[in-house]
Amino acid sequence: GGSSRPPRKRDYRIANLNADVAALIDASGAREVTLLAHDWGALIAWNFAINRVRPLARLVIMNVPHPHCARRELKTWRQLRKSWYMFFFQLPRLPELLLGRNNAAPIGRIFRDSAVNKHRFTRAEAEPYRAAAAQPGALTAMFNYYRALFQTPDARQTGDGMVHVPTLVIWGEQDVAIDIHCLDGMENFVPD
């Protein structure tokens, strides 16, 4: 939550985010890179690997489907019901207003309520997420990831979608936002 928060939607285009990942890899001086990612980071990592922005030794993804599979499943009612929030986040200012009220208290509740084992994710554990969301510009930055995904074309530029590095996908079967059917057919794009 302490990173910069570029204010413009276009700052969250996949090409810019890929450039950020590439800069981190370059700055690390690493000769072999395993890219490990979850949630929004995983969407970026899929795109990074597909477009071969930098060589990777391995890719590890947690609970985000391959982009081609995700696009297919977003056409089903089953996944649309789970992904309603992505469409809500497209609205200007309203998501910030509703989720930012009471010092971003709804964010803490969302983190707790979406946990499978709610008793294992206490208020204290959700507090850093709420506090980060309450910072000036944080909610707009969070929603701009979704806004750029839907409103800029580069996120959909994944060519044939092939991933040419060994890939491990770890999946929690009770994910509240992404249906497990999103994994169907992934082997067509990830041969290893």
Walk through the language-model features, giving the residues of each.
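Flexible "cap/lid" subdomain of the alpha/beta-hydrolase fold that forms the substrate-access gate
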Residues: 2-36, 40-192
